[in-house]
A protein has these predicted regions:
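Long, basic/Gly/Ser/Thr-rich N-terminal segments
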Residues: 1-90
Length: 91
């Protein structure tokens, strides 16, 4: 069972043919997402990074990777200059 956290990619993610146990829409802080899912069992989390408040600040992604099992997270990146830059992707 999978979890979807969506914002800008909501329409694309809603078309996936997967089992979903929880779906969260909107913008949340990294701390809110960690608190929401740290004791929640799921196979994979599909995370639209635009759902993370101030996602351009890499420390917010680091908070999520430290607070949740990063091996279970699939990131959906927007097609913009910042998130597709090599410096952003290398961090």
């Amino acid at each position: 069972m999978n979890v979807i956290v969506a914002n800008e990619a909501k329409s694309m993610l809603s078309e996936l043919d997967i089992d979903i146990i929880k779906s969260v829409d909107g913008v949340h802080t990294a701390d809110e997402l960690v608190d929401m899912f740290k004791n929640f069992f799921y196979a994979r989390m599909i995370l639209d990074i635009t759902a993370i408040e101030n996602y351009n600040d890499i420390t917010n992604l680091q908070k999520i990777s430290m607070g949740l099992d990063a091996d279970k997270i699939i990131l959906v990146l927007p097609n913009n200059e910042i998130s597709t830059s090599s410096s952003y992707l290398s961090k």
